[in-house]
Amino acid sequence: MTRLPPRPRVLLADDHIRLREALRDLLEETGFEVVGESGDGADAVAMARQLEPDIVVIDLRMPVLNGLDATRLIKDGRSATQVVVLSAFESPELERQAREAGAFAYLDKGTMARRVHRVLLSAAVQAVLAANLGPPGREAGAG
């Protein structure tokens, strides 16, 4: 039986340090382990490759490399890691773009506080499944 890790590992990437601090506190209080933090998209990609977190939470608008491009690179390099894109904008078009880039979910910062725990738990489950079964659409053992 596939089980969640005791504390799903999360990398936070946002150029606003206060938001990262608030999100880190919320996640750690609810059982997640924040394994790293980044203030720009390129650094977030490098950290995701090095740390191999279960989940990357990344802002859409980041210096150096935006959140959509960073998501594509993270998903290309480690398909089991789930990416949750944050944005100040509630936009179906941006959500569609985030999902096309490989994001597990898109959260607008206005409603994030109410939804982040549930969305990240779902992402942790998907990360475990992807690590054990391969990317969605592939059967276990298919190569």
Language model features: what each stretch is:
Residues 69, 90-107, 111-114, 118-122:
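Alpha4 helix (beta4-alpha4-beta5 surface) of REC/receiver domains from two-component response regulators
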Residues 46, 68-79:
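Short amphipathic alpha-helix used as the core "switch/output" element in two-component signaling
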Residues 51-57:
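Active-site beta3 strand of CheY-like receiver
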Residues 40-43, 65-69:
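Acidic catalytic/metal-coordinating carboxylates
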Residues 1-9, 117-143:
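Non-catalytic signal-transmission and effector/linker regions of two-component phosphorelay proteins
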Residues 17-36:
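Two-component/phosphorelay signaling modules centered on CheY-like receiver
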Residues 62:
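Receiver (REC) domain active-site loop signature in two-component systems and cognate sites
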